[in-house]
């Protein structure tokens, strides 16, 4: 597991080193409406039969990223808690055409690598058929423990 995580992080760092200043601004997230939480939890299930022809709309992607790691308060705090508010997580999206880093402050995607790198970041065949692979990567330096983890 540590080897796989190390390889994935190395690949992401390589993507970052190759990055261009290309940015994709996302639409504002829809913060009201939707399915009630308890209903969503009761319907939650894993589906490994992914249709490669289906894709998320920009609005769906915006909502998903904001819910996962967006900023929901004026002081910059997030929708998801982090220990001691260190905000050590980076969220990456790897898709058919490119890999991106989610910039929560700008609610945008920053290009880190062109091309389809899904097979390089997942060993699970079903994931390669999905529209996006979401990667949460922790910056150990922000955690206060350095490389101890």
Name what the model sees in each region.
Residues 141-149:
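Amphipathic, heptad-repeat alpha-helical segments used for oligomerization and assembly
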Residues 1-5:
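Positively charged n-region of N-terminal signal peptides that target proteins for export
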Residues 6-15:
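Bacterial N-terminal signal peptides
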Residues 18-130:
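N-terminal amphipathic, basic helical "cap/leader" segment at the start of enzyme domains
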């Amino acid at each position: 597991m540590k080897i796989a995580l190390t390889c994935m992080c190395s690949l992401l760092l390589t993507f970052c080193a190759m990055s261009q200043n290309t940015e994709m601004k996302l639409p504002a997230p829809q913060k009201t409406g939707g399915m009630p939480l308890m209903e969503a939890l009761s319907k939650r299930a894993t589906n490994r039969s992914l249709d490669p022809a289906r894709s998320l709309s920009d609005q769906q992607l915006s909502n998903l990223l904001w819910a996962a790691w967006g900023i929901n308060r004026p002081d910059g705090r997030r929708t998801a808690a982090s220990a001691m508010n260190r905000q050590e997580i980076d969220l990456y999206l790897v898709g058919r055409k490119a890999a991106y880093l989610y910039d929560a402050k700008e609610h945008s995607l920053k290009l880190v690598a062109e091309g389809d790198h899904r097979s390089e970041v997942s060993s699970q065949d079903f994931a390669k058929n999905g529209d996006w692979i979401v990667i949460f990567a922790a910056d150990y330096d922000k955690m206060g423990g350095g490389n101890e983890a």
